[in-house]
């Protein structure tokens, strides 16, 4: 890691440009990751269950917990799907981490059906803007609680 991202660039372009490049890459990657995590977990409709104080266990089953604590966003946007590597289908990512992201759109149909059958809320925002707005509303609610 250090040699690929720091040593080789320092040798090739000097330490100032290498450091600047490293900082830009780190900032951009951090921005993408933080946006994905915030829009997938910290929005209206997702839950934040606390474990039982005696057993230290979550009440729901693992799969139900994944659905309750996660939201999808911009699932009809091919550009967001490509840019985020399918992480806008975050619920399916949590439920099926070993399945390639190219299958998430099809898997999401199955997950929606199962959620409907078992009366589990499936949180999905049709656009990134709607998810971002929900995130802001949720933060405001947390800040005034």
Each predicted region: which residue ranges?
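Hydrophobic transmembrane helical bundles of multi-pass organellar membrane proteins
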Residues: 1-145
């Amino acid at each position: 890691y250090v040699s690929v991202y720091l040593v080789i660039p320092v040798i090739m372009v000097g330490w100032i440009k290498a450091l600047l490049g490293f900082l830009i890459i780190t900032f951009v990657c951090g921005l993408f990751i933080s946006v994905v995590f915030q829009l997938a977990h910290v929005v209206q409709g997702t839950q934040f269950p606390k474990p039982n104080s005696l057993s230290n266990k979550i009440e729901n089953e693992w799969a139900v917990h994944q659905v309750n604590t996660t939201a999808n966003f911009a699932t009809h946007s091919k550009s967001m799907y490509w840019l985020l590597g399918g992480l806008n289908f975050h619920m399916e990512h949590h439920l099926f981490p070993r399945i390639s992201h190219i299958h998430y759109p099809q898997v999401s149909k199955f997950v929606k059906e199962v959620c409907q059958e078992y009366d589990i809320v499936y949180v999905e925002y049709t656009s990134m803007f709607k998810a971002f707005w929900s995130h802001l509303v949720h933060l405001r609610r947390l800040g005034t609680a």
